[in-house]
Amino acid sequence: MRFSVFTAAIAAAFSACCATASPAVNYVNSLILQRADPHIVKHTDGWYYFTATVPEYDRIVLRRAQTIQGLQSAPETVIWRRKAFGVGSGQVWAPELHYIDGRWYIYVALGVSGQWRIRAFVLEGVGANPLTASWTEKGIIQTNWDTFSLDATTFVANGTRYLVWAQQDPSRNGENSSLFIAPLQNPWTIRGPAVAISHPDLSWERIGYKVNEGPAVIQRNGRIFLTYSASATDHNYCMGLLTARADANLMNPASWVKSQQPIFVSNAATNQWGPGHNQFTVSEDGLSDILVYHDRGYRDINGDPLNDPNRRTRVQKLYWRDDGTPDFGIPVPDGPTPVRLRVAANGASSNGAYVRFYTTTGSGNLTGTAALPDTQFKLVSPGLSGGDSVSLESTSNPGTYVRRVSGSTAVQFERGTALNTAALRASASFRRVPGLSDSGGAVSFESVESPGQYLRLDPNGRLSVASVAEGTQGRSTFYLE
């Protein structure tokens, strides 16, 4: 099938005001199979540490590696196992690893065998490496009520360390969990009564179960962004967002503004279902924020989703909008993480522009701002022509590739199934070479079909494949973000 597209358009100009560009990241999804509720932290020793829920719900595991991708094959160490009776003899859910004042702490939800009695619990580890540390139990976190509680996380704002967690609010009949916050006296004891900052009161938070859970915090641009997950743990599972000013009174529920729509949901096109229970980490170079989450690679589940073992850990780059807010985009397809291609050239039609997927017929209307997924592409290597070629596959429309129209400089998007001859595959294949205007930090894409011609932005702001005139190399040069 050929899309009704004559050109690939360019997204609206990128503003350097608040959204800072950072290099592309290179990971392969899924990162770790059968590991839900993932938590990855980069410690000051340069190592990445990983923990997550295992399908048996019977132990706490840790991994470490010097890269995020390295966690995939890193050996796993069991640092705590389910007990025979009492607290910790039931479910073992959603551990998180934190380093506080020279010691390691794991926040985890523990149950009691034969009872639906799940509470947030803390372990303390002494030692430089948490995989070999000496671990002791600090006990259940005592809150306002002795009710179902889980998913504790911690962060520091304005010199105060806070705990945020999910708990059943006894004043709200029929709801499973709300989000609460309190300052910490020490890593296992809250100070003063907690306050609720979010209840599952929106329709998308109440599908299957009425849930707000899995809080995670990232602080940027003078604001505190708190993500959480909602609804049942099947394909309806999704993520919401609370936002507060960094200088706000975080114990005042009015300081937290809830987004009225979910910010990260299932995507049929990319075949990613039930994304959620996220955390944040940073790339190896420290320049990009990384979204860590779980989902499944299929929609339909037989029986209770909690009995399905195939939630898996995934990672992708978190982008930032001009206004300083996070743009989560969509759960990207399996395989290499996609990139954005920012044009290097200066000028009104090109400065800071991104290549985008475009479906409107005509010559390429450049008005409006492209959705993030439409500006993301997987650099498929080897490309459709094989060898050292690469092909640019759309993230928002997987299986669709950038190709040169035969006998023309124009570019269109074509389904890979229609590229069924060597010549057609060559029209959608390029050789990645050092950037023509910046060979140190950028790339250019030379046509396999027409060597010496390059993917480029023409003077009208349209993407084309053509020869490059002296002084216009920047229009054929792209920064990968």
Swiss-Prot record:
Compartments annotated for it: namely: Secreted
E.C. number: 3.2.1.55
Q: Which UniProt keywords apply?
A: Glycoprotein, Glycosidase, Hydrolase, Secreted, Signal
**Temperature dependency:** Optimum temperature is 50 degrees Celsius.
* Signal peptide location: 1-19
Got a GO cellular component term for this one?
extracellular region
Q: How do biotechnologists make use of this enzyme or protein?
A: Sequential addition of Abf43 followed by Xyn11A increases the degradation efficiency of birchwood and beechwood xylans but not wheat arabinoxylan. The synergy degree is high up to 1.21-fold.
Please give the Gene Ontology molecular function terms for this protein.
alpha-L-arabinofuranosidase activity
Q: How does activity depend on pH?
A: Optimum pH is 5.0.
Summarizing the function annotation, the protein's role is:
Alpha-L-arabinofuranosidase specific for the cleavage of alpha-1,3-linkage. Shows high activity against 4-nitrophenyl alpha-L-arabinofuranoside, debranched arabinan, and sugar beet arabinan.
- Please state which protein family the record places this protein in: Belongs to the glycosyl hydrolase 43 family.
Protein's recorded name: Alpha-L-arabinofuranosidase 43
Which species is this record about? Humicola insolens
Top-level taxonomy: Eukaryota, Fungi, Dikarya, Ascomycota, Pezizomycotina
Name of the coding gene: Abf43
